[in-house]
Amino acid sequence: SSSVPRQLPAPPRWFTGRTDHLAALDADLNHQGTAVISAIGGAGGIGKTWLALAWAHRHLDRVPDGQLFVDLRGSSPDGTPTEPAVVLRSFLDALGVLPDRIPSDLEARAALFRSLVAEKHMLILLDNAVDTAQVTPLLPGGDTCTVVVTSRHRLPGLVNAHGAHHLGLDVLTNV
């Protein structure tokens, strides 16, 4: 497929501080040969998404095959997180898969997604994850993609089972 998705929202207009956190994400990205997953955990409204977007926009040159972005609605007011199958349908669509070629089964969708991104250098930003089970089907199978996950929770399953680098975030203090 020749589709190159560019799904990142605009970078935060005013992003300040968090230099250490940006450096930590840089260090994660520089571990060649591993899928980089940074579970940025912390309370609501402290800048997880802004940090992820600010970092991502600084590294667009490292992901020439595009970016995929989704708000997983892990802390949505109506309490209904986005199902992985729905996310995979939108990712496959963005990658140029025709609607009638998208499998109905979650595992088949995940396998097709992994196949399509296996050799690509892409960024996959999974924002506002509720738990590891929601994220796992959305992970690439190879080591060429960079994955950044934000969540209000630590997601220990992502760290333990998938080698994610956890980056905790605290409220910024005035400097």
Regions flagged by a language model, labelled:
Residues 129-137, 142, 158-161:
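Conserved ATPase-coupling elements of RecA-like P-loop NTPase cores
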Residues 1-127, 143-151, 162-173:
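Walker A/P-loop phosphate-binding element recognition
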Residues 154-157, 175:
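Short gly/pro/ser/thr-enriched loop/turn and capping motifs at secondary-structure boundaries
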